[in-house]
UniProtKB/Swiss-Prot annotation:
It comes from Methanocaldococcus jannaschii (strain ATCC 43067 / DSM 2661 / JAL-1 / JCM 10045 / NBRC 100440). Removes the N-terminal methionine from nascent proteins. The N-terminal methionine is often cleaved when the second residue in the primary sequence is small and uncharged (Met-Ala-, Cys, Gly, Pro, Ser, Thr, or Val). The gene is map. This is Methionine aminopeptidase. Binds 2 divalent metal cations per subunit. Has a high-affinity and a low affinity metal-binding site. The true nature of the physiological cofactor is under debate. The enzyme is active with cobalt, zinc, manganese or divalent iron ions. Most likely, methionine aminopeptidases function as mononuclear Fe(2+)-metalloproteases under physiological conditions, and the catalytically relevant metal-binding site has been assigned to the histidine-containing high-affinity site. GO terms for biological process: proteolysis.
């Protein structure tokens, strides 16, 4: 069976993997989050890809969906547990990968729990594989370390220019008749926490997605919508990719209110527990499972 876009899938994985390994070395106390995010996104482009979504840098109890805003001054601190989640695409074929950096040196086991869960479940995949059984494996590994998997976060099957296709890979056991099989491109991302084991929505995290073109009164907002719909019709974008200065924020907010764009909320652990994450993209072929972001 020939897999559509195979070479591009593999190339996107190589780019994402290389950038992840380079970016990890930049994460240190006193370094600005913006510096790391811009390095990631620019490096992906240098290597011949495009960011599949804004670089996510989520610290401590934040599990996902924070990217630095325009002129963001936030810096890493020496007790931070940092999740770096990045994606690259080549002609729409996506690679999605994440790693946790423990600057505090107090959460080695938490980091190990999500990593071990990731590699264990990948090793156990035998297509067609029930996604509920995958969740069971992830849950058992994380719980064996004394932590909880985050039950309302999940991995996802990806298509060309589509990060989430409707099939999710749970981090806990679920009774389901959904399977992944040969030809599927899948992001698997176990999250472990010492908190409640669920996330809740926080404020907007500076990441947006185009929804539709609608009539807009404000000329500046119409212009901004044209830029967004032309450049980011399918995949998420960062506010700093489309705003030149703070005065344009009014236009962005009017697009959210008009449901022209969707703003992703930050996802926080429900009891402010510390969160660790590990993620790889896999491609299921007739010859077995390939980790594209290894």
């Amino acid at each position: 069976m020939e897999i559509e876009g195979y070479e591009k899938i593999i190339e996107a994985g190589k780019i994402a993997s290389k950038v992840r390994e380079e970016a990890v070395k930049l994460i240190x106390p006193g370094v600005k989050l913006l510096e790391v995010a811009e390095f990631v996104e620019n490096r992906i482009r240098e290597l011949g890809g495009e960011p599949a979504f804004p670089c996510n840098i989520s610290i401590n109890e934040i599990a996902a969906h924070y990217t630095p805003k325009l002129n963001d001054n936030l810096e890493f601190k020496d007790d931070d547990v940092v999740k770096l989640d990045l994606g690259a695409h080549v002609d729409g074929y996506i690679a999605d990968t994440a790693i946790t950096v423990d600057l505090s040196n107090s959460y080695k086991d938490l980091v190990k729990a999500s990593e071990d869960a990731l590699y264990t479940v990948i090793k156990e995949i035998n297509p067609p594989m029930n996604i509920g059984e995958m969740g069971k494996i992830i849950q058992e590994v994380i719980e064996s370390y004394g932590y909880k998997p985050i039950s309302n976060l999940s991995g996802h099957v990806m298509h060309r220019y589509e990060l989430h296709t409707g099939i999710s890979i749970p981090n806990v056991y679920e009774r389901t008749n959904q399977y992944i099989d040969v030809g599927d491109l899948v992001a698997i991302e176990p999250f472990a926490t010492d908190g409640f084991g669920m996330v809740k929505d926080g404020n907007l995290g500076n990441i947006y997605k185009f929804l539709a073109k609608r009539p807009i009164r404000l000329p500046q907002a119409r212009k901004l919508l044209d830029v967004i719909s032309k450049n980011y019709p399918y995949l998420p974008f960062a506010e700093r990719w489309v705003l030149k200065n703070e005065s344009e924020r009014l236009a962005l907010n009017s697009l959210i209110r008009a449901s022209c764009i969707y703003g992703y909320p930050i996802l926080k652990e429900r009891e402010n527990g510390i969160v660790g994450q590990a993620e790889h993209t896999i491609l299921i072929t007739e010859n077995g499972v390939e980790i594209t972001t290894k």
